[in-house]
Amino acid sequence: MDINKLINMFAKLPNFGPSSSRRIVLHLLRNKEEVMLPLASGIQDLAFQTKECSVCFNIDVKSPCSICSDTKRDHQLLCIVEELGDLWAFEKGKIYQGVYHVLGGTLSAIYGIGPDQLNLDNIVERIKKFDIKEVIIGIGNTMDGQVTTHYITQIVKGLGIKITRLACGIPMGGEIDYLDEGTLSAALSSRYVIS
């Protein structure tokens, strides 16, 4: 493979531009045995071993994932998050013991993302099937996040369950993946009912 092709592949990753991609490739080339080969092997293993959870859309080595399969978790408490990074932020902080539903993004008129492009179609069915008592909307406080929250509230509110949203700690325009554990913990504990 051409070195420039590898640099361009890294540049397609989030938060990597041409300069940082070039530095990474140079580091890999200088450290083939200790870094490059184990990294390549790890990426290949992940590509073949991971799968999307059939229940919550998490990524794991099994489906249903280890979170959905955990009998110690509160399966009547469902936190709807925008992306996998948000789920991982909650898990890293060890502040939430319910289960999740990963949307895969937010509704966005600007980017043409409608309900059909997100994991929204089975939320009502899941709430009924698993006797969920509370839905926590754990979506960032962006404009698209607010639109998505409103949409979810509309499709869930007739089910007679508690619907809450994360409160203090999330600034306007803020995204959950960028919050520290303390801020995320405060937001989770001070959530409020929206329907």
Curated annotation (Swiss-Prot):
A zinc finger (C4-type) spans 53-68. One of its GO terms (molecular function) is zinc ion binding. CDD domains: TOPRIM_recR (cd01025). One of its GO terms (biological process) is DNA recombination. PROSITE patterns: RECR (PS01300), TOPRIM (PS50880). Residues 76-171 form the Toprim domain. Keywords: DNA damage, DNA recombination, DNA repair, Metal-binding, Zinc, Zinc-finger. InterPro entries: DNA_Rcmb_RecR, Rcmb_RecR, Rcmb_RecR_Znf, TOPRIM_dom, TOPRIM_RecR. It comes from the Bacteria. Belongs to the RecR family. May play a role in DNA repair. It seems to be involved in an RecBC-independent recombinational process of DNA repair. It may act with RecF and RecO. This is Recombination protein RecR. It comes from Ehrlichia canis (strain Jake). The lineage of its organism: Bacteria, Pseudomonadati, Pseudomonadota, Alphaproteobacteria, Rickettsiales.
